[in-house]
């Protein structure tokens, strides 16, 4: 079974840091924040095998560009599958205006 390198963009790392900070600092739940961060990180690392398992997004031009969406709890991980690598572009709260935030 083919394995892919998983690359996380600076923007996606920043998104994850903001998610952690919001839960830990604003909601005053540092243990919950760490758990959420770890679940997202583990899900991202799991993309090294069968990254095509998640659907392409429905909006254009993102769909044509090959952008896929993986749900992790209340968050969406957006990524593109290349020949040998998966590139994670963003990690966003699923209840937000995702199409607007992706552009």
Stretches with model-predicted labels:
Residues 1-63:
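Basic, Lys/Arg-enriched alpha-helical interface segments
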Residues 27, 68, 72-103:
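Enriched for short, Lys/Arg-rich terminal
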């Amino acid at each position: 079974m083919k394995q892919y390198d998983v690359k996380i963009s600076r923007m996606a790392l920043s998104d994850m840091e903001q998610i952690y900070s919001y839960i830990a600092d604003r909601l005053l739940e540092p243990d919950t924040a760490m758990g959420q961060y770890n679940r997202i990180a583990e899900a991202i690392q799991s993309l090294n095998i069968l990254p095509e398992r998640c659907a392409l997004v429905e909006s254009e031009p993102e769909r044509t560009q090959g952008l896929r969406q993986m749900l992790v709890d209340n968050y969406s991980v957006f990524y593109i599958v290349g020949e040998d690598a998966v590139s994670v572009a963003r990690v966003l709260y699923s209840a937000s205006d995702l199409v607007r935030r992706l552009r």
